[in-house]
Swiss-Prot record:
Protein name as annotated: Ubiquinone biosynthesis O-methyltransferase
The protein's role, per its UniProt record: O-methyltransferase that catalyzes the 2 O-methylation steps in the ubiquinone biosynthetic pathway.
Organism: Burkholderia ambifaria (strain MC40-6)
Cleaved signal peptide residues: none
Keywords from the named record: Methyltransferase, S-adenosyl-L-methionine, Transferase, Ubiquinone biosynthesis
EC number: 2.1.1.222, 2.1.1.64
Length: 232
């Protein structure tokens, strides 16, 4: 059984043509991308590395990692989003190998293949996030890096990430997030403990509305990032 929610897939497929419009529904991802990219590169040193972007969507992070010299493969189950990603890759001249395949299926086919695996803003959209974490651990080489980003589950994150972002500021379309699927850092840590990965760093991401920018912080109450390594 595919670890995907048909409703979630359809939601993002319907918006696929808007992925690369920096002023449309995916504007927060465009604003967030430089922060997460810099953080990933600081840990993994992407140049010359083989990287896998799970849940790549339209390819915002995939192209950015390729631009820093990584050999990138992006996977997603939305063929509409991958079509947009392929087209933008042709237009930008940045080479990324895209494929419509589930992380678990790729893990069976290509275990221990990648130096870097990213799974950003995806875990909160799937029925079994633990299954995705396990697949990431299988896909990465011994000594390699795995990076996650997701949303904490508490009153503050509900007020800011759902009510504030979707209904008040309208930074995101209504219904983008299902609060019940938000993941506490302790829960994500428990998923990681069931694999060969170990957590190296957990960082928060804070949005500054005055400057309209994201920045790394020690506040993990809403958005947070987790860097992991697989044992050598």
């Amino acid at each position: 059984m595919t670890n995907a929610d048909p409703h979630e897939l359809q939601k993002f497929s319907d918006l696929a043509h808007r992925w690369w419009d920096p002023n449309a529904e995916f504007k927060p991802l465009h604003e967030l991308n430089p922060v997460r990219l810099g953080w990933i590169d600081a840990h993994a040193h992407l140049a010359g590395k083989r990287a896998l972007d799970i849940g790549c969507g339209g390819g915002i992070l995939s192209e950015s990692m390729a631009g820093l010299g990584a050999q990138v493969k992006g996977i997603d189950l939305s063929t509409e989003a991958l079509g947009v990603a392929d087209l933008h890759s042709l237009e930008s001249g940045v080479t990324v190998d895209y494929e419509a395949i589930a992380a678990e299926a790729l893990a069976e086919r290509e275990p221990g293949t990648y130096d870097v695996v990213t799974c950003m803003e995806m875990l909160e959209h799937v029925p079994s996030p633990a299954g995705i974490v396990s697949a990431c651990a299988t896909l990465v080489k011994p000594g390699g890096w795995v990076f996650f980003s997701t949303l904490n589950r508490n009153l503050k994150s509900y007020l800011f990430a759902v009510i504030g972002a979707e209904y008040i500021a309208r930074m995101l379309p209504k219904g983008t997030h299902d609060y019940a699927r938000f993941i506490r850092p302790s829960e994500l840590a428990s998923f990681v403990r069931g694999t060969d990965l170990h957590i190296v760093e957990i960082k928060g991401i804070t949005y500054h509305p005055i400057g309209k920018r994201f920045a790394l912080s020690n506040d993990t109450d809403i958005n947070y990032l987790v860097a992991c390594r697989r044992g050598a």
